[in-house]
Amino acid sequence: MARAFNKEVRRSITRSVGRFLAIAIISALGCGFFAGLLMTSIDMNISADEFYDATNTSDLYVTGTLGLDDADIDAIEHVEGVRSVEPVRMADAYAILADEKYVVRFNSLDLDAARNSDTSDGMHAISDDEEYINRPILVEGSWPTGPGECVVAADAVLDEPMQVGDVIEIVGGSGDIADTFARTQFVITGLVRSPYYLMTSNFGSSELGSGDVDSYAFVAPETYAEDFPYTGAFVTATGAADELYPSDGYDSIADALVARREHEFRLPDCTPLGSAG
């Protein structure tokens, strides 16, 4: 019976070779397409994880209702499982760029660490400083040398693109400008891409304007008023860089650190960023 069946199969193929080849090719294409879809997701995750590691992207972001102080930063540094901590200041403001008013988020930047980093390949921010977290990549121009200079988003979609040499002037905010900024005018020295602002179409929400941040800028810590507190702290977790993001191994490390903060320490709110370390 098996011989008869095999003989009939051979006859069916030889009588309609064209149809058989067409079905075989369609099946092969379908299998190849499906395999490609499966591999695309894996390859994208691997590429993203390599980028996160190359820019020392934070695993957690710690915030406080009234901001953070040096005592809070010291407490965070002593939490078991914390690899490194970088306190940061962020503030949204109305700023004039090319005679147009936009909502710009100003971020503090360790200028020495930035200048000592190597971003020449456009994908990595090589630095020996573990506390230099969420390292921007310089696309054009140079890093700021002082409080009167800044680098801005290379991918911001504005009516007129920002260029090296342009001037940004802060003209307003949610309160008195002097309570937040010690300086309100900056010369753009470079354009950057930041792992903290991955979505080029959306840099975050704001209480100002239409509710969206139009662009971001990195400025010297001295830009802010003397009494302006840290608005948060970027944290990297021990062992997170060795895990692929996203993965169960990575999530367990980040979740354990958040749980440890909640149950063992009286610290400000701690939120996973959803990005690898």
Language-model regions, residue ranges each:
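Membrane transport/envelope proteins' first extracytoplasmic loop
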Residues: 2-23, 27-277
